[in-house]
């Protein structure tokens, strides 16, 4: 045992020697005395003590055993001596001007750099409150007494012998969703639940059942046992009845804040635990923070503030039980932690310095709810924010999500609270008052989180908690850290597409004059300084990396969705690809079962490439060493939109195989696009490697020219080839580029003959293939002149299979017939012309099956717009052509443009131009066909008008009622406004009283007369229900509601037979 020497008679001698030495040193005013160093002062004191050594040695000495030499002797001696005036301003109590670390310490208590703070003066008031002053400002003060040892906290569900259940719901007794959700979140924290069930001795002696008395801890324990034992939802009346005891200003039945209730509930439980001790009011704050609630939820924040004016450094420790994170500038929980623990520059009037007397204002009140979604992971690593010893920094500090409180609602004044809690099996459940249902981890991470509870993950620790050499308290070893954060739910985080930027430097702090905050942990057996970790986020299963990233070392960078992508070194297996060219590739939903590697690299971020617009059903070759499994592609022919960059292929001979390059090697458009764009593309729903190092075979002999020059060249060549040839094969010309032809993979055609007019130029660019066509003459203004201009002999015009009823329905053209010399051109009044068709282009691998006048847009612009509500003009703001042209002219145009009645092509040698205009020997047949089409078109139009009149839209102008009478011969006999269905339902008698049954009166047709009798003054205003004036007005209203205009007179049956 350590021993101490009790000085009895020589105490006065020693005191006198000290006073004489100090008094002589202070009274000496010469320059030599002022120049004495600390060594001279110590030597003078030693000489005075040696002079009295004989008396001290001959004095009687008594010994006694003490438990601790430091506490019993040294502390008592320090309290007896007072420094009057030290010779050296930097020397205190005989210590030299060097501190424990060997750095020079100035008079103001910090070293020359102002980085560290010297020990407090022994006469300071804080020294008397804490009998164990520490010379290291980075170390927490040690409490005198520990109310609840940290080792008694059991973390995890499996640390208890009890079999934990999921737990039942809690009944909402009136705006108590905040109370139910907070209790569910607290009771699903394993450390708190294990402590509550361990209070069996106190629970037996507590009078919690009495109203208005008893501790809140026992009420929480009984509520926990009730949720574990019952099969149905419980009513938390033990907590609800003590609402006033928990917080005085909370009103029963009123909506309250869940976080506010959480704070008051934890404080009430702490007060209930402190009331078990007799002198709890005399305990200091450090002792009060060692309660079980403080050991589970508590921690310390170490703040270091440096004044830019006087360079004064202030280090403070602040106790916390939850972290309030600001998410206004954060997109994830990690970003919120970065912002909370990062350095910041305090503006003017931002901090109250001891010398400047300035104040700090850190928080601002916002009157609205933060409707911002942040992403979080089920595990977080706080190693970089923990101020621990170097030995403890090697151990990971990982916390796992155990429960949370969510808020549903757009405002902070109203809404609904729910809770999510974990079980011993690792699954999560959603607690919505009395409803309990399981929830997946993905939905948990996408939940609207308001308060989040994380508990230390012991599986990530390197050694058991009991065997740790340093006594770490609170958040570094055996406690939970609640992290409240107000968020709003949003769609699930999408996967990051594009290259990943390299991680930053090892030191995340760049501002030198700022405030630094870190989580502090108490050390019991060590007094060395603690350091603040500045590393980046690391994987929870690996220790954090120290220092900067080494060259060629495998590093990791987190992505937005939490999936870590590795970047291998230059000597890895993928040595065929440069590291600087590795990029992320887009992931398709069709290939979720394929394990793909995503390779980040230190390249700059680029926009994703345009999708491949010319995909065929051949499987592209992967030009990268990465093995990619491609599924069977589906043929999706598409066309490009805008040719940003183009290359000329006009003078290049068509290839026999559209998939074969001039070099003799097959390649796909997706490969070419992948090698020229930002390095990734999606082909048929499968993942292709599009790195810049992929070898793509491109014809190097192509001369790249401007797209505008190509367009003018194609227009010029099309103009030169307008003259007719004797032998022409019908083909289909691409006009708008929106109707590709379905062509098989193995299809190959010979190059076109020299007599065939060249097809329009095909421009191949990165965005796809463009075919440029030439528009004919400017559209002429439509008038009532001749419909057709006939030139030369008639030609075979291949038109799609269309009918006069539906001019937009089309099919494949019929079998070609031999062309006859002397082509006939037809120019209609609307400006569209039917030109001789050319040989299809086979070099680009697709064709079109639409004609020049068969454009869907052109047809839509000519249609009438009746029936679309109020009377409107056409899409371009002008009246429709059908409304301003004669009906016969419109029919003639349709006859000439869309073929015969049967939908087949017009026979050779005859062209229908009008009912009275022909130029062929078969004029009688043409007239018969034209007149038949004209009559049929008139009948169809009359039927359309009748349908419009029957099914006219009300447009809000006229009240519609159902009519039981059919329109026909007996339409005039119907009663206006009469609805038999409504009359039947209105006069129905449900009681079966009477002789003939329950509904006998409705079968004798008496209700029509009753309706007329009741409404005779309502509808008989014009001399009777069926008067001519009334019928004319009704017809006029129907006509005006249909859009106005007058329908043409329908031909009689005799006229139709004559025609």
Swiss-Prot record:
Domain USP, first and last residues per copy: 168-457
Gene Ontology MF term list: cysteine-type deubiquitinase activity; K63-linked deubiquitinase activity
Keyword set, alphabetical order: Hydrolase, Nucleus, Phosphoprotein, Protease, Thiol protease, Ubl conjugation pathway
Subcellular location: Nucleus, Nucleolus
Residues with the Phosphothreonine modification: 632, 636, 756, 799, 820
Active site: 177, 416
One of the GO BP terms on file: regulation of apoptotic process
Segments for region (Disordered): 22-45, 102-145, 464-512, 554-853, 941-1005, 1022-1059
Biased composition range(s): Pro residues: 751-760
Catalytic activity, EC: 3.4.19.12
Ranges of compositional bias, category Low complexity: 121-138, 479-494, 561-580, 740-750, 963-974
Bias (Polar residues): 23-45, 603-615, 673-702, 806-818, 833-853
Recorded catalytic activity of this chain's protein: Thiol-dependent hydrolysis of ester, thioester, amide, peptide and isopeptide bonds formed by the C-terminal Gly of ubiquitin (a 76-residue protein attached to proteins as an intracellular targeting signal)
Biased composition range(s): Basic and acidic residues: 703-720
Annotated function: Required for maintaining multiple types of adult stem cells, including male and female germline, epithelial follicle cell and intestinal stem cells. May function as a transcriptional repressor by continually deubiquiting histone H2B at the promoters of genes critical for cellular differentiation, thereby preventing histone H3 'Lys-4' trimethylation (H3K4). Controls selective autophagy activation by ubiquitinated proteins.
Family: Belongs to the peptidase C19 family.
Protein name: Ubiquitin carboxyl-terminal hydrolase 36
Species assigned in the record: Drosophila sechellia
């Amino acid at each position: 045992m350590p021993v101490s020497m009790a000085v009895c008679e020589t105490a006065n001698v020693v005191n006198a020697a000290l006073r004489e030495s100090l008094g002589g040193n202070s009274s000496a005013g010469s320059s030599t005395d002022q120049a004495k160093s600390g060594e001279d002062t110590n030597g003078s004191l030693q000489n005075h003590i040696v002079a009295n050594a004989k008396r001290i040695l001959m004095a009687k000495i008594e010994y006694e055993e003490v438990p601790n030499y430091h506490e019993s002797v040294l502390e008592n001696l320090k309290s007896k001596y007072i420094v009057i005036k030290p010779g050296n301003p930097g020397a205190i109590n005989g210590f030299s001007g060097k501190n424990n670390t060997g750095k020079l310490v100035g008079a103001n208590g910090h070293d020359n750099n102002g980085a560290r703070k010297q020990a407090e003066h022994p006469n300071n008031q804080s020294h008397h409150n804490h009998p164990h002053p520490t010379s290291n400002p980075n170390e927490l003060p040690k409490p005198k007494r520990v109310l609840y040892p940290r080792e008694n906290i059991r973390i995890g569900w499996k640390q208890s012998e009890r079999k934990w259940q999921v737990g039942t719901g809690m009944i909402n007794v009136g705006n108590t969703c905040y109370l139910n959700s907070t209790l569910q979140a607290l009771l699903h924290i394993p450390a708190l639940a294990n402590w509550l069930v361990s209070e069996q001795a106190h629970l037996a002696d507590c009078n919690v059942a009495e109203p208005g008395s008893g501790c809140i801890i026992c009420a929480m324990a009984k509520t926990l046992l009730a949720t574990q034992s019952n099969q149905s939802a419980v009513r938390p009346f033990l907590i609800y009845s003590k609402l006033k005891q928990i917080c005085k200003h909370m009103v029963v039945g009123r909506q309250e804040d869940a976080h506010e209730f959480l704070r008051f509930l934890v404080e009430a439980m702490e007060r209930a635990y402190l009331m078990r001790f007799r002198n709890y009011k005399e305990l200091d704050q450090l002792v009060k923070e060692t309660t079980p609630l403080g050991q589970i939820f508590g921690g310390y924040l170490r703040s270091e503030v440096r004044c830019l004016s006087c360079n004064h450094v202030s280090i403070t420790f602040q106790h916390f039980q939850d972290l309030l994170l600001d998410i206004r500038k954060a997109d994830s929980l990690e970003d919120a932690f970065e912002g909370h623990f990062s350095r910041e520059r305090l503006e003017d009037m931002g901090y109250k310095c001891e010398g400047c007397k300035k104040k700090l204002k850190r928080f601002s009140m916002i009157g609205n709810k933060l409707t911002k979604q942040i992403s979080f992971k089920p595990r977080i690593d706080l190693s970089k924010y923990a101020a621990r010893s170097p030995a403890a920094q090697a151990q990971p500090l990982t916390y796992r999500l155990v429960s949370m409180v969510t808020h549903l609602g757009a405002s902070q004044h109203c809404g609904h609270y729910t809770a999510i809690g974990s079980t011993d099996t690792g699954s999560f459940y959603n607690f919505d008052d009395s409803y309990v249902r399981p929830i997946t981890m993905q939905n948990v991470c996408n939940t609207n989180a308001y308060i989040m509870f994380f508990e230390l993950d012991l599986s990530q620790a390197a050694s058991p908690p009991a065997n740790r050499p340093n006594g770490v308290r609170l958040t570094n070893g055996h406690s939970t850290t609640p992290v409240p954060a107000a968020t709003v739910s949003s769609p699930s985080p999408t996967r990051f597409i594009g290259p990943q930027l390299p991680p930053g430097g090892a030191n995340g702090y760049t501002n030198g004059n700022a405030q630094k905050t870190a989580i502090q942990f108490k050390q019991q057996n060590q007094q060395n300084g603690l350091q603040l970790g500045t590393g980046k986020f690391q994987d929870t299963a690996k220790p954090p990396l120290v220092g900067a990233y080494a060259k060629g070392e495998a590093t990791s960078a987190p992505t937005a969705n939490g999936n870590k992508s590795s970047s291998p070194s230059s000597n890895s297996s993928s040595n065929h690809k440069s590291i600087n060219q590795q990029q992320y590739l887009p992931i398709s939903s069709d290939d979720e079962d394929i394990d793909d590697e995503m390779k980040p690299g230190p390249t700059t971020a680029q926009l994703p490439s345009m999708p491949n617009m010319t995909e065929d059903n051949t499987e592209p070759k992967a030009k990268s060493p990465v093995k990619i499994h491609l599924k069977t592609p589906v043929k999706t022919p598409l066309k490009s939109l805008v040719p940003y960059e183009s290359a000329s292929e006009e003078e290049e001979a068509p290839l026999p195989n559209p998939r074969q390059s001039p070099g003799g090697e097959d390649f796909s458009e997706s490969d070419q696009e992948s090698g020229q764009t930002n390095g990734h593309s999606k082909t048929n729903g499968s993942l292709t490697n599009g790195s810049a190092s992929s070898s793509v075979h491109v014809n190097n002999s192509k001369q790249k020219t401007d797209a505008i020059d190509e367009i003018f060249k194609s227009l010029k060549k099309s103009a030169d080839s307008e003259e007719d040839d004797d032998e022409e094969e019908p083909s289909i010309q691409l006009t708008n580029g929106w109707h590709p032809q379905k062509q098989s993979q193995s299809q190959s055609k010979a190059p076109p003959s020299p007599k065939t007019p060249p097809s329009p130029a095909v421009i191949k660019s990165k965005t796809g293939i463009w075919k440029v066509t030439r528009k004919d003459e400017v559209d002429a203004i439509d008038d009532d002149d001749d419909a057709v201009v006939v030139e030369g002999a008639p030609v075979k015009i291949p038109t799609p299979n269309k009918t006069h009823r539906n001019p937009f329905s089309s099919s494949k053209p019929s079998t070609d017939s031999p062309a006859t010399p002397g082509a006939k051109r037809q120019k209609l009044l609307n400006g569209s012309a039917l030109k001789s068709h050319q040989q299809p282009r086979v070099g680009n691998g697709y064709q079109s099956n639409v004609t020049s006048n068969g454009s869907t847009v052109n047809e839509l612009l000519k249609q009438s717009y009746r029936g679309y509500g109020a009377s409107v003009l056409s899409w371009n703001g002008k009246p429709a052509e059908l409304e301003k042209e004669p009906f016969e002219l419109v029919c003639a145009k349709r006859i000439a443009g869309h073929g015969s009645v049967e939908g087949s092509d017009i026979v050779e040698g005859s062209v229908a131009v009008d009912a009275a205009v022909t130029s062929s020997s078969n004029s009688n047949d043409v007239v018969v066909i034209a007149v038949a089409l004209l009559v049929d078109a008139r009948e169809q139009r009359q039927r359309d008008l009748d349908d419009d009149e029957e099914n006219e839209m009300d447009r809000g102008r006229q009240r519609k009622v159902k009519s039981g009478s059919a329109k026909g011969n007996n339409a005039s006999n119907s009663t206006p406004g009469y609805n038999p269905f409504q009359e039947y339902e209105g006069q129905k008698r449900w009681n079966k009283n009477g002789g003939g049954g329950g509904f006998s009166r409705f079968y004798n047709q008496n209700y029509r007369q009753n309706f007329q009798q009741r409404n005779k003054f309502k509808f008989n205003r014009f001399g009777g229900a069926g008067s001519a004036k009334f019928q004319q007005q009704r017809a006029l209203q129907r006509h005006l509601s249909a859009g106005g205009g007058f329908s043409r007179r329908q031909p009689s049956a005799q006229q139709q037979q004559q025609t």
